[in-house]
């Protein structure tokens, strides 16, 4: 999977779940299937399109990419209605 495909998946995920305030680390944790108190596996494991969907991408790289995309969305660089 290319970095642009991963970035597209990040943007789609964040916009589809815009009721949450996302950080790059939170998105990366979902994409790697790592539960947290705010994003428990019991709830987010049902989101098959995202949970554990990018295990092939280095976690720290995914955090950096997700942080960049989340900030871009917040700044209005992308339309919230993709």
Show which residues each predicted segment covers.
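Accessory DNA-binding and partner-docking regions appended to nucleic-acid-acting proteins
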Residues: 1-82
């Amino acid at each position: 999977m290319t970095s642009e495909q991963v970035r597209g998946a990040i943007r789609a995920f964040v916009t589809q779940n815009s009721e949450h305030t996302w950080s790059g680390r939170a998105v990366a944790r979902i994409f790697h299937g790592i539960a947290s108190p705010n994003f428990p596996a019991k709830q987010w494991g049902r989101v098959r399109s995202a949970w554990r969907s990018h295990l092939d991408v280095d976690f720290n790289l995914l955090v950096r990419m997700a942080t960049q995309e989340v900030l871009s969305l917040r700044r209005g660089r992308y339309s919230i209605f993709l």
